[in-house]
UniProtKB/Swiss-Prot annotation:
Source organism: Homo sapiens (Human)
Annotated residues for binding of Mg(2+) 1: 419, 463
One Gene Ontology molecular-function label: actin binding
Catalytic activity from the UniProt record: ATP = 3',5'-cyclic AMP + diphosphate
Post-translational modification: Phosphorylated by PKA; mediates inhibition of adenylate cyclase activity at membrane raft; does not influence either CALM1 or PPP2CA interaction with ADCY8. N-glycosylated; N-glycosylation is responsible for raft-targeting; is not necessary for CCE-stimulated adenylate cyclase activity.
Record key words, sorted: ATP-binding, cAMP biosynthesis, Cell membrane, Cell projection, Coated pit, Cytoplasmic vesicle, Glycoprotein, Lyase, Magnesium, Manganese, Membrane, Metal-binding, Methylation, Nucleotide-binding, Phosphoprotein, Repeat, Synapse, Transmembrane, Transmembrane helix
Activity regulation (UniProt): At rest, the N- and C-terminal domains interact, as part of a larger autoinhibitory complex, with calmodulin pre-associated at the N-terminal domain. Upon a calcium rise, calmodulin becomes calcium-saturated and subsequently binds to the C-terminal domain. Fully calcium-saturated calmodulin then leaves the N-terminal domain, binding solely to the C-terminal domain, and the whole autoinhibitory complex dissociates, resulting in activation of adenylate cyclase.
Site entry: Essential for autoinhibition maintenance: 1200
Composition bias type Gly residues, residue spans: 56-76
Record's protein name: Adenylate cyclase type 8
Residues marked Essential for CALM1 interaction (site): 1205, 1207
Length: 1251
């Protein structure tokens, strides 16, 4: 059995993955893909690396990789929000070369090499919500993360952050705690002095020297003044003054030591006070570690020099001086460990706070990106209506069953259709990049004109552009707006023609009436309009004249005679207009007006010779169109148009900001705000009990108690070092019984060595397996760790006190009858009973060494120690102290050694307990921040899943990666040419006859409901494995457009036409699907499908509403194969037939047909009807449905719920005095500042559930 079976993984083979557990009760989510499109793009989207809410380490050094555990038990099957699981989170970060371990197989650690981009098991990907390549470890923040060996961390002098701003914020973050510690230390010292004064006046054998009283009052006054200054300046954010006040406090205490050495102290020779000063310097004064070390060494050296130069004892020996030096060295060593590891813990807590703040900021950024993506699909008024309906939906899992369509009916609108004449020829002469650039600039210009003329762009269909006026805000002049829009479009296209020398023009049709608008289907959502009037506007365009605006009688009636018109004769050019007897007219516009440039066009700065290039643009110098998705995934994450007129969906009032900066500056600002909130200890009052510091939530307390203590080994090694110092101190003093003392300390050292061995065994493969298993269990078990800690403290305590048992003092003699010969020279250790107390103090400091030991347990242990010492010094061995006092302080105004010793221990008890309380509070606050950060990160993960759904429904995956993964500072528009692509159009000819706008079918809404079901079924077919190479492009009314072979992998695949076969299979599957729908809807719809293949140009155009589309002869031919086809049949041209017939498909020859736009140059086209497959494709697996798609309503619902949670947290964090959490986003929160509705109430809104 390998060691990896015993303890957690270490080394480069580790993989840090978090597999999100599907929500309970949601069967569909179990199969949802875990891989997100944002996986490799997070760093580029947010301009900084993703700082996760978990531990990361550095993989350097021979000691192993620096690693740490998952914050709240994030094992492989852990679901963070419930804080379930058995793994635990570490309290401290690990520096370079450090090593951390976990339970046997229960934890997974981060790997710095970053393999998160690999695909996970099950084919779904393993991203979870972290990507380690962009996740800096804690060591990335530190100048020096410390040195570790075999899991034991040793202090270093420099323990600061690399960033000055981060260091400044850290100092401010713990400013309040350090201020409080300094005040408590000074108050404790003042109380000690007052207690000494009272005891001295009541118990001293001689009156107090007046100079002692003056010095006592002076130093007490200094400390009171320091406390007052620190308290008065509590609002100061600078930590420098606090450090200087700490230096002043240290100087005052050291001066008192000097006074004691000169004979003017109340604590005898002052050794005990030196120990307290050293402990306070390292653990309670706000001094950097380097300053504390210098101060500690200075204090120790001063005391040793005073003992040598001005001896205060009757008998002084070199051994005694060395013992004092060793005593001070021990306290300095323990203090350095305590100070370094405490500061490390506080820095870790600060980093966790920073991670929490950054997670919240990223969540807000994800909210904004979600909103932008939604608004790129839907107009604002539709989003408002959906949010208003969803605002009270609280069921977390309802979004997975939420299938509502939102159809709005608007009366009195005008619809404009515009088509670029000559575009087909243009697409054959321009390169892909040039074509997409021209279209983007042209349609960006149209979008700008639409805004100026109060029109809403609906959709771009290849080279067709259509918009509506009077939607959503009703306008009396909607027809005028559309006519002016059309005139501006004609001016613009003629300007383009003059600049590019290409024969292009606009054919425009306008009709007035009513529309239904909304979004249908589950994939490639696009806002669209439907109605009989929309069809008429479309036919007016197709039956129009290039360069003229073709309008209907309904539109003419709305114009009120403001424009000159002439007969349009549309019936002569369009069968639909003739069949329905629609009168048409042409707007008469002076030719010179049409030839003039649009008013907003200024002279370009480019020369005409440059413009004659085939790649030339026509954009003027003062304006250039935005790139698609710049306002969504661009580096300047500016707020979307949400902030204008409007919706304050963003948490923490981010909508008031000009930019959302996710860089360090914004995070630091947020941390400053968090510091202000934290200063009120609100979090502590809400979650932590006052004295015990236990969590009020028992499950949270259990989770905290199960945390792995990453510095437990370091604490135990430090305790062992303290034992060695205790042994050295007592060995330096002479003993009459050397052998018993040798045996005693040998046993204690062996026992403590065994404790160290058993807790570090997992790092030594040479040790027995059972020992390594035991080691792993101890390190992961709260109770076992506490047993080891208590055993270590007990051993040190026994080492400090057992030597008193070997004293030769006759205990049978009553103390009151004792007489002492002051001239006698004692060379036995019992002659120095104060060292039993001093080493006992070191044993008490051992409690402070164990940073994670519960402060209440520390208090209990310390009280037991003091009780035992009180029992020994006041009763059994009181004579030792009396004899010592008579020998060294006879006749002086000196308080008894045993009284001073108990007071010294009481000082240490209070100091160690308070220090333990501060550390535990920091650790528990750290834990709370981590839990909160992890919850918010999981919320961000959910939002990213929604965003991935949104993005996947706007762009194909490989195109989305293009926009997310690359540095697009100077990047051109996305465009790509393909040589071997399959294109399919599938329409439902009978749906036009089925569609009617009557009261019975809710003015056409019920007809659209059925169309939504049909499109949704088609979309779900794309979720099958066999159709993974097919991309839906769009729906055009009741026509479904799909393409195969767009992914780069398929272009280089050996099976060049495998995707075309899949497209043919897909068309056959569509016919089967429509038959199933007919059975349930009692209809007889038939599909008319056209398929073609060849070269196309693909690209993304439009900045505010980006659209992915394809252009070229192949697209036109596929569309004509549909429009010239036969209901219930699949028509393909001869070239496509020649490929598919060899792939197992059967065909029926139709004959030669005339195809508009192609037959003019190439003659009639031979076409065939696809009948089906003759033989199955051996490479096609049985149909397996991939995870289902969510409706747009479901995605918006997820966004609303996330925003509600953020709003509730915000109000809680801000401690709203109203006591009422209004956490829901309703229609009022989404109104403009003036309080008016942003649009007219939609009529006929349908919100009933789909079957």
């Amino acid at each position: 059995m390998e060691l990896s079976d015993v303890r957690c993984l270490t080394g480069s083979e580790e993989l840090y993955t978090i597999h999100p557990t599907p929500p309970a009760g949601d069967g569909r989510s179990a199969s949802r893909p875990q891989r997100l499109l944002w996986q490799t793009a997070v760093r580029h989207i947010t301009e900084q690396r993703f700082i996760h809410g978990h531990r990361g380490g550095s993989g350097s050094g021979s000691g192993g990789s620096g690693k740490a555990s998952d914050p709240a038990g994030g094992g492989p099957n852990h679901h963070a929000p419930q804080l379930s699981g058995d793994s635990a989170l570490p309290l401290y970060s690990l520096g370079p070369g450090e090593r951390a371990h976990s339970t046997c197989g229960t934890k997974v650690f981060p790997e710095r090499s970053g393999s998160g981009s690999a695909s996970g098991s099950g084919g779904g990907g393993d991203l979870g919500f972290l990507h380690l390549d962009c996740a800096p470890s804690n060591s990335d923040f530190f100048l020096n993360g410390g040195y570790s060996y075999r899991g034991v961390i040793f202090p270093t002098l420099r323990n600061s952050f690399k960033s000055r701003d981060l260091e400044r914020l850290y100092q401010r973050y713990f400013l309040g705690q350090r201020r409080k510690s300094e005040v408590v230390m000074n108050v404790l010292d003042v109380l000690t002095k007052l207690t000494l004064l009272v005891l001295h006046l009541s118990l001293a054998s001689a009156p107090m020297d007046p100079l002692k009283g003056i010095l006592l009052g002076f130093f007490t006054g200094i400390e009171v003044v320091i406390c007052a200054l620190v308290v008065v300046r509590k609002d100061t954010t600078s930590h420098t003054y606090l450090q200087y006040s700490g230096v002043v406090t240290w100087v005052a205490m050291t001066t008192q030591i000097l006074a004691a050495g000169l004979g003017y102290g109340l604590l005898g020779d002052g050794i005990g006070y030196v120990l307290f000063t050293l402990f306070a310097t390292y653990s309670m004064l706000p001094l950097p570690l380097t300053w504390a070390i210098l101060a500690g060494l200075g204090t120790s050296l001063l005391q040793v020099i005073l003992q040598v130069v001005i001896p205060r004892l009757a008998v002084i020996s070199i051994n005694q001086v060395v013992a004092q030096a060793v005593l001070f060295m021990c306290m300095n060593t323990a203090g350095i460990f305590i100070s370094y590891l405490s500061d490390r813990a506080q820095r870790q807590a600060f980093l966790e706070t920073r991670r929490c703040v950054e997670a919240r900021l990223r969540l807000e950024t994800e909210n904004q990106r979600q909103e932008r993506l939604v608004l790129s699909v839907l107009p604002r008024f539709v989003v408002l209506e959906m949010i208003n309906d969803m605002t009270n939906v609280e069921d977390e899992h309802l979004q997975h069953q939420f299938h509502r369509i939102y159809i709005h009916r608007y009366e009195n609108v005008s619809i404009l259709f515009a088509d670029v004449k000559g575009f087909t020829n243009l697409s054959t002469t321009l390169s892909a990049q040039e074509l997409v650039r021209m279209l983007n600039e042209l349609f960006a210009r149209f979008d700008r004109l639409a805004h100026e003329h109060h029109c809403l762009r609906i959709k771009i269909l290849g080279d067709c552009y259509y918009c509506v006026s009077g939607l959503p805000e009703p306008r009396q002049d909607h027809a005028h707006c559309c006519v002016e829009m059309g005139l501006s479009m004609i001016k613009t296209i003629r300007y383009v023609r003059s600049r590019t020398k290409h024969d292009v023009d606009m054919r425009i049709g306008i009709h007035s009436g009513s529309v239904l608008c909304g979004v249908l289907g589950l994939r490639k959502w696009q806002f669209d309009v439907w109605s009989w009037d929309v069809d008429i506007a479309n036919k007016l365009e197709s039956g129009g004249i290039p360069g003229r605006i073709h309008i209907s009688k309904a539109t003419l009636d709305c114009l009120n005679g403001d424009y000159n018109v002439e007969e349009g004769h549309g019936k002569e050019r369009n069968e639909f207009l003739r069949k329905h007897n629609i009168e048409t007219y042409l707007i008469k516009q002076p030719e010179d007006s049409l030839l003039s440039l649009p008013e907003d066009i200024v002279k370009e700065s480019v020369s005409s010779s440059d413009r004659r290039n085939s790649g030339a643009t026509f954009t003027e110098g003062s304006w250039s169109p935005e790139l698609p998705f710049d306002n969504i995934v661009g580096k300047q994450n500016t707020l979307a148009a949400l902030t204008r007129n409007s919706i304050n969906l963003l948490p923490n009032h981010l909508a008031q900001a000009l930019h959302v900066q996710s860089g360090p500056e914004e995070i630091n600002k947020r941390i400053e705000h968090t510091i202000d909130l934290r200063s009120g200890d609100k979090l502590r009052r809400e979650h932590i009990k006052p004295f015990s510091l236990m969590f009020k939530d028992s499950s949270l307390e259990h989770k905290y108690s199960q945390m792995r203590d990453e510095v437990f080994k370091s604490n135990l090694v430090c305790a062992f070092i303290v034992l060695l110092f205790i042994t050295a101190i007592q060995s330096l003093l002479p003993s009459s019984r050397v052998m018993p003392m040798t045996i005693q300390f040998s046993i204690l050292i062996m026992l403590h060595s065994a404790l160290v061995l058993i807790t570090t065994a997992e790092d030594y493969k040479c040790l027995p397996l059972i020992l390594r298993k035991t080691c792993c269990w101890i390190n992961e078990t709260y109770l076992a760790r506490n047993v080891i800690i208590f055993a270590s403290i007990l051993i040190n305590f026994l080492g400090a006190i057992l030597n008193i048992l070997w004293c030769d003092f006759d205990k049978s003699i009553p103390l009151k009858n004792l007489t002492f010969n002051s001239s006698a020279v004692f060379t036995d250790i019992c002659s120095y009973p104060e060292y039993f107390v001093f080493t006992g103090v070191l044993a008490m400091v051992t409690c402070a060494v164990f940073l994670r030991l519960n402060s209440v347990l520390k208090l209990a242990v310390l009280l037991i120690m003091i009780a035992i010492y009180a029992l020994l010094t006041e009763t059994v061995y009181a004579g030792l102290f009396l004899r010592y006092d008579n020998l060294n302080h006879s006749g002086e105004d000196f308080l008894g050694t045993k009284e001073v010793s108990l007071l010294l221990m009481a000082m240490f008890l209070l100091a160690v307990f308070y220090h333990g309380q501060q550390l535990e509070y920091t650790a528990r606050l750290d834990f709370l921040w981590r839990v909160q950060a992890k919850e918010e990160i999981n919320e961000m993960k959910e939002l990213r899943e929604h965003n991935e759904n949104m993005l996947r429904n706007i762009l194909p995956s490989h195109v989305a990666r293009h926009f997310l993964e690359k540095d697009r500072d100077n990047e051109e528009l996305y465009s790509q040419s393909y040589d071997a692509v399959g294109v399919m159009f599938a329409s439902i000819p009978g749906f036009a006859d089925f569609y009617s706008q009557t009261e019975m079918n809710n003015q056409g809404v019920e007809c659209l409901r059925l169309l939504n079901e049909i499109i949704a079924d088609f979309d779900e077919l794309l979720g099958e494995d066999r159709f993974q190479d097919i991309e839906k492009i769009k729906t055009i009314g009741s026509t479904y457009m799909a393409v195969s072979g767009l992914s780069p992998e398929k272009q280089q695949c050996e099976d060049k036409w495998g995707h075309l076969c899949a497209l043919a299979d897909f068309s056959l599957a569509l016919t089967e699907s429509i038959q199933e729908i007919n059975k349930h809807s009692f209809n007889n719809f038939e599909l008319r499908i056209g398929i073609s293949h060849g070269s196309v140009v693909a690209g993304v155009i439009g900045a505010k509403k980006p659209q992915y589309d394809i252009w070229g002869k192949t697209v036109n031919l596929a569309s004509r194969m549909d429009s010239t086809g036969v209901s219930g049949r699949i028509q393909v041209p001869e070239e496509t037939y020649l490929i598919l017939k060899d792939q197992g498909f059967a065909f029926d020859y139709r004959g030669e047909i005339y195809v508009k736009g192609i037959s003019e140059q190439e003659g009639k086209i031979k076409t065939y009807f696809l009948l089906g497959r003759v033989q199955p494709n051996p490479f096609i697996l049985p149909p397996r449905r991939l995870p289902g798609q969510y409706s747009l309503a479901a995605v918006v619902l997820g966004l609303v719920q996330s925003l509600n949670r953020q709003r509730q947290k915000q109000l809680l964090n801000e401690n709203n005095n109203t006591g009422i959490i209004k956490g829901h986003y309703n229609r009022r929160t989404l109104l403009s500042p003036s309080g008016t509705e942003p649009g007219a109430q939609a009529e006929g809104t349908d919100k009933s559930d789909l079957p």
